[in-house]
Amino acid sequence: MKNKQPIAPPNAPSNAASKAPPNVPPNAPPNAPLNAAPIALPLARYSAWRRAGDLVFLSGVIAVDPATATIVKGYADIPGDARRLLGETGEFSTDILEGPILAQSWYVLDRIRSTVQAAGGRMDDVFKLVQYFRNLDHFPYYSRVRKLFFSGEPPASTVVEVSAMLPTAEILIEVEATAYIPLSR
């Protein structure tokens, strides 16, 4: 799952925002919603995101690549530029402890960014996040990553600890997002 393409800083504009998402992605399941850009394909039978007027609602995003069903387990599963931004040390004891939650946090927020851009918005349009953690001790690590994606005023936020997440215990975080993206853009 290593991505060799260079990544832009989290708040940089993307070319994806200027292109309308295809009506039906080539790898979409037969019952995929028409608004499912390839980055936002759901992992089960639900909409990854829905628009209601100027509001865009994202279902919970986890650190699983829907195209390959690969779980992000640590630094090795994200691009090198992201690893450097997150502070990969190269020290086994530190990276094995912090790497999984930092990598999953980055992946989830990057997928949210890509989905919001596919809907015609940017991260500054996200005004509400609901973050689910298997262990609240992970919140400070996630918070560090979230600051990379929201450099200005952060969205309203709810944090919840849960006993388990689907599809496996390797999933450490899930994030729902709501954005205000005017149709007139």
Give the positions of each predicted feature:
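Long, intrinsically disordered low-complexity tandem-repeat segments
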Residues: 8-30
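Short, polar/acidic, helix-capping and beta-turn segments at strand->helix junctions
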Residues: 2-10, 29-185
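Short, low-complexity, intrinsically disordered N-terminal peptides in bacterial proteins
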Residues: 1-2, 24
